Structure formats: structure tokens, C-alpha cells
Amino acid sequence: MEIVYSDMETSSCDYSFSHTDDEDSRSSLHPASPASSCGKPPASPAGLQQKKRRRGRARNETTVHVVKKNRRLKANDRERNRMHNLNDALDALRSVLPAFPDDTKLTKIETLRFAHNYIWALSETIRIADQKQGKSRDGPLLLPGLSCMADAPSPGSDSCSWPSGASSSSSSPSYCNSDPGSPAAMDDFGYLQTDVVYSYRNFVPSIY
């Protein structure tokens, strides 16, 4: 009886060993997934793609935000530099404008208006000087009273006499009728310039 029991135990052990070999082969053919081992269902390919898209969107939004911030900072720097250059140019313009003390503060528009009027006054002065220079080249280089005396036909003639009721002759020049002592005759070159300077100075008190 002992021999029979021992044979049965040996056969049962062999059967158990063969069963474990079958289980090992099955486990090697079908490996367990990490999700199933943890008790979670496996993720589908569609879910993985959605996660990748979300990550890409988050990265894109972050990049766009950084780019917008950099552009805004660069635009602010450009505007700041432009205003600094404009203020420097206006300060240089104020330094060359006349009739203003050093402590006078002018706004931008007042500085530009005053510079416009100052340039206009200078251009008018140059234009009047050119006109007078052209007239002096055409006519005799003498004062009005002296030219009248030089063009007189005779000392006793009435053609160049000063205005005393007698009519002038046709041979006398047109400027013989002016009084040599009058400001219009002596300051013929400067009376228009005086008007220009007067109109220019009328602008100065309105700025203060």
C-alpha cells in the first residue's frame, strides 16, 4: 500500500509541474498590460491624440502670449525714443529763436508757430532786400535829392525845384517831388523792413 501511495504522489507532482508549465507558456503568450495590472482600463488612441492636441494648444497659447508681450515692449520702446528725439529737436529749436529769455517755457505748438512766423519774417526781409537791390542796379546810385540836383538842366530851372506850388517838368525824374529831409526819402530802403519786423514782433507778446 505504501508503494501505491508513493506512486500516486509522484504522478500528482508531475501533473502539477506540467500544469505550471502550461500557465507559464500562456502568460508569456499574453503579457499583462500595465493598465490592467493597476486596475485601470487601457487608453484608446483617440484619447492619446486629444491629449497631444491639448498639449500643443497650451504650448501655442504660451508662445503667442510671449510674442505679443515682446512686440508690445518693443513698440513702447520705439515710442519712447521717438518722443525723446522730438523733445530734443524742440529744445534745439527754442535755443535759436530770438526774443525769449532762457527760463521761458513754450509748448510744442507754440514753438512751432513762433518758428513759422520767424522764418516768414526772415524770408520777407530777404525778399525786400533783393527787390531793393534790383531797383538800385537799374537806377542811379545817388540819393533822391542829389539825383534830382544832378539831373537839373540849369541852376535856375524850376524842373527840379522842391514842391512849392510849381509843376515839375517832364524831364525831371519821378522821385524829385520828395522832400530830401523826409523819412520816406532818407529811409526808403528800410521802411518795408520796419513793417515786417513790426508784424513779427506783434506775435511775440501773444506767446508770453
UniProtKB/Swiss-Prot annotation:
Composition bias, Polar residues: 8-18
Region (Disordered): 1-62, 159-180
Residue ranges occupied by any bHLH domain in the UniProt entry: 70-122
Pfam families: HLH (PF00010)
UniProt tissue specificity: Embryonic nervous system. Expressed transiently in neurogenic placodes prior to delamination and formation of cranial ganglia. Expressed early (6-somite stage) in Rohon-Beard spinal sensory neurons and later in neural crest-derived dorsal root ganglion neurons. At 24 hours post-fertilization (hpf), expressed in specific regions of the brain and spinal cord. In hindbrain, expressed in presumptive neuroblasts adjacent to the rhombomere boundaries. In basal forebrain, expressed in dopaminergic progenitor cells.
One cellular-component annotation, GO: nucleus
Subcellular location: Nucleus
GO biological process, one term: olfactory placode development
SMART domains named among the record's database cross-references: HLH
GO MF entry, a single one: DNA-binding transcription factor activity, RNA polymerase II-specific
SUPFAM superfamilies the UniProt entry points to: HLH, helix-loop-helix DNA-binding domain
Keywords recorded for this protein, A-Z: Activator, Developmental protein, Differentiation, DNA-binding, Neurogenesis, Nucleus, Transcription, Transcription regulation
Main location: nucleus
Assembly mode: Efficient DNA binding requires dimerization with another bHLH protein.
Function field: Transcriptional regulator. Activates transcription by binding to the E box-containing promoter. Mediates neuronal differentiation. Required for the development of Rohon-Beard spinal sensory neurons and dorsal root ganglion neurons, but not for primary motoneurons or autonomic neurons. Required for development of all cranial ganglia but not associated glial cells. Regulates epiphysial neurogenesis, acting partially redundantly with ascl1a and downstream of flh. Required for the development of basal forebrain dopaminergic neurons; involved in the specification of dopaminergic progenitor cells.
Protein name, as recorded: Neurogenin-1
Protein source organism: Danio rerio
